[in-house]
């Protein structure tokens, strides 16, 4: 985290002016046990992209017109959480919403929805394959990892290990909230 701190701080300093969105770099954490009410998880943070990247695309260059009140590209992306199982990654020109839908103890569906400016016309202002490229590939890679992890966890040889307190703290919070929830305890 220290390695990217100066890059993030530089992006945060310019974000509101370049994007035209006051407070865009302000963080908010209110999820799982810290949510204002059951299921009312909400979270926002903004972080810098790689040098020279304006958006989340194959080459880091814009794939659609700016959305909403955005005035420019600040080299950042916003992470949002809405409820315990719905997340959104927002770039100035597009965003992807992903929702996890548990179906059973071993099955979960993941729904992905991409958004662009409401006035943008497919094939004219954006190419949906270019908009979806990064998170389509990321989701395929995630599915591969998750499937292999599930096979391992369901193996008779599986022995759980500890979570990393720095890199997996959010996962640890989710598990604590989830176990309390299914046990009928107040989260």
Predicted features, each with a name:
Residues 1-187:
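C-terminal catalytic domain of Rieske-type non-heme iron oxygenases
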């Amino acid at each position: 985290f220290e390695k990217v701190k100066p890059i993030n701080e530089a992006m945060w300093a310019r974000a509101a002016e370049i994007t035209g969105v006051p407070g865009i770099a302000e963080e908010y954490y209110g999820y799982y046990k810290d949510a204002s009410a059951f299921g009312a998880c909400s979270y926002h943070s903004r972080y810098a992209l790689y040098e020279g990247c304006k958006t989340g695309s194959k080459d880091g260059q814009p794939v659609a017109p700016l959305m909403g009140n955005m005035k420019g590209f600040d080299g950042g992306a916003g992470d949002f959480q809405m409820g315990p199982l719905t997340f959104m990654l927002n770039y100035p020109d597009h965003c992807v919403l992903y929702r996890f839908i548990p179906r059973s103890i071993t099955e979960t569906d993941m729904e992905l929805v991409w958004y662009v400016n409401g006035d943008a016309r497919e094939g004219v202002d954006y190419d949906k394959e270019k908009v979806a490229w990064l998170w389509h590939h990321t989701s395929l890679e995630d599915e591969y990892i998750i499937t292999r992890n599930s096979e391992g966890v369901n193996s008779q040889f599986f022995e759980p290990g500890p979570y990393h307190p720095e890199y997996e703290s959010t996962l640890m919070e989710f598990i604590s909230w989830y176990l309390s929830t299914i046990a009928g305890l107040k989260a």
